[in-house]
Amino acid sequence: MKGVKAEDVHHFLLNTEDLRHRRVSRMVEEVQKILLQVTSDISNRDSRFHCISNAGIHSDSLKVLSPSQFLVTVPLRGLSGFRQKKTRRWRYYSPSGTQLLAPAMEPEKLHQWLEIEQFQKSTPHWHDNDVNIKGDLVPARIIHVFLEHLYRAITFCSLSDKVNVLESYGPSIRLNVETSEQMVEVELVPVVEVPGYWPKKSQWPRFFKRWPLRERVQCVKSFGFDLLARSNYHWQLSFLRGERLLLEAMDDDGGCRMKCYRAVRQMKEDVWCPGNHPVINSQHLQMIFLWASERHPSAKAWKDLGRCFLRIVRRLQKCARQRFLRHYFVRRANLLKYADTAQLDALADKLSRFLQNPSLGQGASSVC
């Protein structure tokens, strides 16, 4: 197998990275400005929803999944003092509130039920029937309430020419937001923030692992986790703040992990997995890098940029071929469980051909 020289990766990043950063930063700034208006109006109408922060590309409320796909979380207010407790096992209601003869589906590995009693403090509106069924906070109902406010806010803020709500087949809110660069698809997700608490579903860190350091682990856990409203009944566990903290400190030992990550991401976006709805996004890549950092904890393993680049490409190919990628914090969850298998197979084939004759020239030429 041919190799890739470190200077080739450096040259590739020099020709592509700055352009991408400037484009994405402009789009993030414009999207945040628009959504700040919209969510501020929603917050004024319904105090249960907080407006998003406007902190640029490093905002905790916005994640760039790809240049054409953003994830924006909308914090929920009036819920505090979360505690883990054993919830009742079966639910016999639909999201609309009608009685079912058979119980609703149990949560998957990365999901859980959420009861109002799990919070030591909750404002009276969270007990209302528009979001609560038999003591459960129901994501589908919260999304429905938020969506109604969203339509009114877009009209009130005179943003109908900039923002278009997309038709959705599940409990999610997706928008097309027009920017000066291109149209961006934004998923708006209500989120319950749980700072200072670590969920039992996350058996992390694993025993006898040298990465990350104990101090970093304690810092990550102090940020807690989030619960995202992305399904009918269940709340999805999310660790975006912890992931960001680990990524930011990844090269404190002088390694080349983040340069390697940016090179793989650029090739993925330009050559291996282009388009508006890539089967692999930045969230998947970050998981791959977190696992690789745990498996190769020494600084020596991350000195040769060319070798590290190919190591990650091989790992990405393996994930695509096997259609399996463990979540870093909840390792029993497969992040590719519902991914398009045809797209994963096509990606694996592209990566196989690339590894037979690796060249970064194709990625650089597609950007120019």
Swiss-Prot record:
A Pfam family the protein falls into: Mab-21
InterPro entries found in the cross-reference section: Mab-21-like_nuc_Trfase (IPR046903), Mab-21_HhH/H2TH-like (IPR046906), MAB21L/cGLR (IPR024810)
Cystine residue pairs: none
Record family assignment: Belongs to the mab-21 family.
Protein name: Protein mab-21-like 3
Native source organism of the sequence: Xenopus laevis (African clawed frog)
Organism lineage: Eukaryota, Metazoa, Chordata, Craniata, Vertebrata
